């Protein structure tokens, strides 16, 4: 998916980082991150056991008896997974909202409300028989940061937003990155009468999720409102 959509991904990266599109992205190993974090820096550790518990709970939203699972965008399983994810933030007292593109966004305020938000997240929708951790790890990583900050009684200077992007995989209608593209203000090639793999129109599917095809572009964010975007991604 990334190789086939490199041009669009470059544009998304340029939006979040306020820099021209780059031909390559630097890879940083976990060991390097760990070494840097120990060089006199103030840091806290997340509860890995709790993260795994959350991942297993989300996994059940779409799990099949044969051990595989599917959480297709806009499906009952996708909705359930998002409801479970929202529940974690509700317990923390962190408000959530859904924008016009269906992106689920939780926001933890910082100490300086004038600063742009640090955005962390990924997606929860999957391809058929998808990977257990694909996308979900990025979402849970953002949740873990919020849980840890609250547990430690800390706050960031910047607001922290955890986002679950809508329809990243694009399996249902044949085109992905809808939520992130809408948030970045990309031109969207979507139409009310587009048919999904089950023969349902996009309008029908969107309305079933409380969305409107005509209003998806309203999810566009001002680049100045986002300080940076971080995604923890595997698989």
Positions of the model-derived regions?
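Acidic/histidine-rich catalytic neighborhood of metal-dependent amide-processing enzymes
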Residues: 127, 137-235
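A non-catalytic alpha/beta surface segment that caps or lines the substrate-entry region
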Residues: 63-109
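General beta-strand structural signal in soluble alpha/beta enzymes
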Residues: 96-100, 120-122, 162-164
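Low-complexity, intrinsically disordered or signal/transmembrane-proximal segments
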Residues: 17-18, 38
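N-terminal capping segment at the start of a domain
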Residues: 34-75
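Intrinsically disordered, low-complexity segments enriched in serine/proline and basic residues
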Residues: 1-2, 6-14, 20, 26-31
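Catalytic-core environment of secreted peptidases
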Residues: 88-92, 104-137, 142
């Amino acid at each position: 998916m990334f190789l086939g959509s490199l041009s669009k991904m470059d544009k998304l990266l340029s939006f979040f980082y306020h820099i021209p599109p780059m031909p390559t992205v630097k890879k940083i190993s976990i060991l390097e991150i760990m070494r840097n974090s120990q060089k006199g820096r103030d840091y806290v550790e997340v509860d890995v056991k709790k993260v795994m518990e959350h991942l297993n709970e989300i996994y059940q939203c779409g799990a099949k008896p044969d051990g595989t699972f599917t959480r297709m965008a806009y499906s009952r399983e996708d909705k359930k997974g998002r409801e479970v994810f929202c529940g974690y933030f509700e317990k923390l007292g962190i408000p959530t909202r859904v924008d016009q593109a269906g992106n689920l966004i939780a926001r933890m305020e910082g100490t300086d409300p004038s600063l742009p938000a640090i955005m962390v997240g990924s997606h929860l929708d999957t391809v058929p028989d998808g990977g257990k951790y694909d996308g979900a790890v990025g979402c849970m990583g953002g949740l873990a940061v919020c849980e840890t900050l609250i547990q430690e009684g800390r706050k960031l200077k910047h607001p922290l937003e955890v986002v679950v992007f809508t329809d990243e995989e694009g399996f249902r209608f044949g085109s992905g990155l809808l939520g992130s593209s809408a948030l970045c203000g990309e031109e969207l090639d979507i139409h009310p009468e587009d048919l999904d793999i089950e023969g349902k129109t996009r309008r029908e599917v969107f309305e079933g999720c409380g969305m409107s095809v005509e209003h998806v572009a309203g999810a566009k964010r001002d680049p100045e409102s986002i300080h940076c975007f971080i995604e923890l991604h595997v698989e």
